[in-house]
Amino acid sequence: MSSVDTAWLRMDSTTNLMMIVGVMVFDTPINVSRLKTLLEGRLLVYPRFRQYVHDDGLTAHWIDDDTFDMDAHLRRVRLPGAGGERELQAMVADLASERLDKGKPLWQMHLVENYKGGSALITRIHHCIADGIALIGVLLNMTDEDPNAPDTPRAVLGPAKSKVKKFSSDAPESTNIFSALGPLGEQLQNRFAPALQALAPMAGAAQQAFDQLGPLKAPLESALESAMGEGVRIGNAVVAKYNRWTDDPTEAVDTAKMVAGFAQELAYLATMPNDSQTRLKGKTGTVKCVAWSVPLDLTRVKDVGYVLGCSVNDVLLASVAGAIRSYLVSKGDAVADEALLRAFVPVNLRPKGKEYKLGNQFGLVGLELPIGEANPVARVFEVRRRMAALKSGYQAIVSMALLGVVGYLPKAVQRQALGLLSDKGSAVMTNVPGPAKPLYLAGSKIAQNMFWVPQ
């Protein structure tokens, strides 16, 4: 398991379960046998949905579940009473408060068979499996645009071949990072060769000491392999960057600016002040409350964005800021003009064409929502300005890198490090690009699709 995914695995707490909870609503009932067949042919092609996690305290691994039982992951349930929206929200809230079984693959679905004459599917997936962008890819792999399409099994799409020269951890001895870096690598090798030769006699002694570790040897070997894997990925990025430097020397200047930007963002994250104190800032609890609004017409949101020269995301975030302001005012709270509510917003860092890969490849940026701004138009412009500043910086990349480092730390240290971040904000706000056309799951049209992320 990657270090970032390990961090999400270990962030689990009794008051903040690291689950993505989703609800799909269907106008017509879903046949459970057909759904089960579809999941077996289109969901289980992703190995992580057939694997459980083994965490030895140092590293975490995906292990095939030889006793996998679909019935343990797909449950049939019925709502009490009228079987309406309130009853469905209560059921989703109960499930959002319930841990997934860590002895099994970390996902579960509940098929609600009596919701408003149709059905609903409640899905819980641990965040260590994948992020929102990857899960949209999973959803698209499971669904069809034609309600009469057969439930034919599908394979996971593979990666496109890269044209960038790479090195790998299993490359021949003659091919290493120095040779892969060309002339720059030759200079580095010449500079460090004496030191490497001096260290060579220590290798045998180190191996002997390593062999004496007994039961600790295997987990340490695994940790080192994971670290080497991260090193190879970083090395590949360095090689790609070096290739661009040789083609365009101005790339080196841009890289220097980027490194300075990284340092600046790291310093900001370390000293980031808490946001304004409001009734929304508090400690998470074990009992969750789930709700949703009447769906918004996306066309109207786009029209507003077009007129104001803003993105859909800008309009939605500004609307949420206005709703929070209205809520606080309705409760009699004073909202100062300079009041800010920081929301952590995920930013996708997954390379284009890599959507098929599961795991987490996103960073977080701290957006300070201008809840003190009473003018809705001015609020949209201010959100646009702040989002543009965040997008031009490196906060998302730095935050993902920090999560990767945290993933290698002992659990106790992880909790302290992550606790510092959670104190800096009051909310998490996210949206992911959904399908542009109506989709059908097991022949039933998806009328509504909603999800909630960890807090």
Identify the residue ranges that each predicted region occupies:
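Basic/hydrophobic alpha-helical interface regions
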Residues: 8-9
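Soluble acyl-CoA-dependent acyltransferase catalytic core bearing the H(X)4D motif
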Residues: 1-3, 12, 21-455
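Short, surface-exposed loop/turn motifs at beta-strand boundaries within globular domains
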Residues: 17-19
